Amino acid sequence: ENGLYNPGRGFRLETAVDVLHEKDTPTKELLELSEKYVADSVSLAQSYFYLTYLIGEKLSEENFQTMQAYFDELQKQGKKAVLRFAYERDFMGRAAAGPTGEQILEHLEQLKPFLEKNKDLILVVQAGMIGAWGEWHSSIQGLENSEETKATVLEKLLSVVPEERNVQVRLPEFKNLLKDKPELYKRLSFHDDFIVIRPDRWDADMHEGTAKFDQIVAESPYL
């Protein structure tokens, strides 16, 4: 509890908030996990905001109050968010619904003032929105199959995230969608939940010795 503490680096929790249905308890998981791991001096929270039941709807003032309550608690605890917005909580076609590209763009535009307001509590924003858990695969609408859609969503995300903050993508090919736009490309960094020590069917060809792995190794020190 009294160890080294830096809200921009360190251990992290993982929390998820259903923005519509958890409006009365948006900080519940954050509070529980913070208490559970208090001895570890956790300084970051992987923060998922699920807009699952808001597809096709404008985000309301109540929705923003729900998300703000979460960020207010982060500030109280001295933590920062590794932030991701998503809609679909299952994969392989099992999600009940998913947004169109246009619906994603509309929500992103609404989120711009919220992100600006809370930028000091955000370490980085992950390029969620598309597919299962915002991982850019398995979307109901098949959005991951369109290079144009992915590039458009990514470019829009970069336009609404404050310039002081980077955006993380899971795979180098997503970053490479904007290779011809250096001012945007340089703000893209990487995250991957499945980098492993040996080749695996789920590693998306991200193991040592592949071009993707080499790109991450080469570019990550500068991001």
What are these regions (language model features)?
Residues E1, E32-S34, L111, E155, ...:
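Intrinsically disordered, low-complexity boundary segments flanking structured domains
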Residues E1-S43, Y48:
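Boundary/entry segment of secreted carbohydrate-active catalytic domains
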Residues R9-T15, S43-S47, A81-F85, L123, ...:
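Hydrophobic faces of well-ordered beta-strands that scaffold small-molecule active sites
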Residues L54-E57, D90-A96, W133-H137, N176-K179:
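Extracytoplasmic/secreted cell-surface and envelope-processing proteins
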Residues N63-K80, A97-V124, S146-V160:
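An active-site-proximal structural segment forming one wall of the substrate-binding cleft
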Residues V82-M92, L111-E144:
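Active-site groove signature of glycoside hydrolases
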Residues V124-G131, E135, S139-L223:
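Catalytic-core regions of glycoside hydrolase
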